[in-house]
Amino acid sequence: MNSKAKKRVVLPTRPAPPTVEQILEDVRGAPAQDPVFTALAPEDPPDPSPRAEDSEIQQEQIYQQSRAYVAMNERLRQAGEALRQKFDGLRQAGQRLEQDISQVTSATS
């Protein structure tokens, strides 16, 4: 009368995975309109011959991006140098402060 004691259902064994040859045969035999090939395809294929105007615009955009990158790189280099100089100044000020503190403590002793 124990309802918790149910019989276990024995599942069939798993089939072996397909071999590479079987997969390739399946892919080669699939039609071109198979959802596997069309699901991720773009709706409109890109124009095979881009217009010269589009190419020039794209080249100009890339050129401007390159110029902006070079300018930003130079600004970062300058900022790094300024930061190093300020760090050195603070370190020297800290050393002077320690010297002054030691002089004051030795003078008061």
Curated annotation (Swiss-Prot):
Region ranges (Disordered): 30-62
Family: Belongs to the UPF0449 family.
UniProt entry tagged with the keyword Phosphoprotein: yes
Alphabetically ordered keywords of this record: Coiled coil, Phosphoprotein
Phosphotyrosine modification, residue list: Y63
Protein name: UPF0449 protein C19orf25 homolog
Chain coiled-coil ranges: 73-104
Lineage, highest ranks first: Eukaryota, Metazoa, Chordata, Craniata, Vertebrata
Pfam families attached to this UniProt entry: UPF0449
